[in-house]
């Protein structure tokens, strides 16, 4: 019997639209405008119900904000004395470090260390327009249909990649522009090794380009570093490590990257 999970099953079998994340972001951005429009246009009983609902949402939000602000330790904390004895005058302005404050500062410090650990060589890159990224392919008997696109940049596809049927393939990734290996430079050792690419983790241009595996300047890729003999603190061999593309692959014809260590 069906268990009302047909939507999840369809997503598992066929995946999501290529522009799903972009559509979701735009839908969320439009939500505030829709709420404002409804608040202005609804009248009568519907308007009262809508206003009541919005009021309840705002009250709960204020409570959350207040609770969050109270969780932040501000002002003077407990005095230094723990035995109940009175403090001398010159010690009254001193404060004892609160546990919550210490935990908060340690979390902030860890975040800073993590950000420093994963700092990339190229923090900013030039934006690429869709006209530069995609080439319109005319199809049909009279070449009147223009719903197909061909990627003009270098891409990476996995080992088990299979093209969709030609009549259903909307975005074409040419075989001549597919890359499987990259020239990866180790910044500390100063050596460059030709390593196989495992995956494209993040393209700074768009989430859709990440899903398509487009390789542009600033893209974070995962490479197989087992040949370098790198090991963890526990003695295990490191298999994959992140690297950032530092060149324009479509101009140079190859992928150059710097290992993130």
Swiss-Prot record:
Arranged from A to Z, the UniProt key words for this protein are: Nucleus, Ribosome biogenesis, rRNA processing
Q: Which residues form a coiled coil?
A: none
Q: Where is the composition biased (Basic and acidic residues)?
A: 1-40
Q: Which ranges belong to the motif Nuclear localization signal 2?
A: 51-58
A single GO cellular-component term on record: preribosome, large subunit precursor
Q: Which InterPro entries match?
A: NSA2_fam, Ribosomal_Se8/biogenesis_NSA2
Origin, by domain of life? Answer: Eukaryota
Protein role: Involved in the biogenesis of the 60S ribosomal subunit. May play a part in the quality control of pre-60S particles. Under normal, rapid growth conditions, high levels of NSA2 would allow the progression of pre-60S particles through the ITS2 processing.
Name of this protein: Ribosome biogenesis protein NSA2
Q: Which organism is it from?
A: Saccharomyces cerevisiae (strain ATCC 204508 / S288c)
């Amino acid at each position: 019997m069906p268990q009302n999970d047909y939507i999840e099953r369809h997503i598992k079998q066929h995946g999501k639209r290529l522009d799903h994340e972009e559509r979701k972001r735009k839908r969320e951005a439009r939500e505030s405008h829709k709420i404002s429009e409804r608040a202005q246009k609804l009248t009568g009983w519907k308007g009262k119900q809508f206003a009541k609902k919005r009021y309840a949402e705002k009250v709960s939000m204020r409570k959350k904000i207040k609770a969050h602000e109270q969780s932040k330790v501000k002002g003077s904390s407990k005095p230094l004395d723990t035995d109940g004895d009175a403090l001398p005058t010159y010690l009254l302005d001193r404060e004892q470090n609160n546990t919550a404050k210490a935990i908060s500062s340690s979390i902030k410090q860890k975040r800073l260390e993590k950000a420093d650990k994963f700092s990339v060589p190229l923090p900013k890159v030039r934006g690429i327009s869709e006209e530069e990224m995609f080439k319109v392919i005319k199809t049909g008997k009279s070449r009147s249909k223009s719903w197909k696109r061909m990627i003009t940049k270098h891409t990476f596809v996995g080992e088990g990649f299979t093209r969709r049927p030609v009549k259903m393939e909307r975005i074409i990734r040419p075989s001549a522009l597919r890359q499987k290996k990259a020239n990866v430079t180790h910044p500390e050792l100063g050596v460059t090794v030709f390593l196989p690419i495992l995956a494209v983790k993040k393209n700074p241009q768009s989430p859709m380009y990440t899903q398509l595996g487009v390789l542009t300047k600033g893209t974070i890729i995962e490479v197989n570093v087992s040949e370098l003999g790198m090991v963890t603190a526990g003695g295990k061999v490191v298999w994959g490590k992140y690297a950032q593309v530092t060149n324009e692959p479509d101009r140079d014809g190859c992928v150059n990257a710097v290992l993130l260590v």
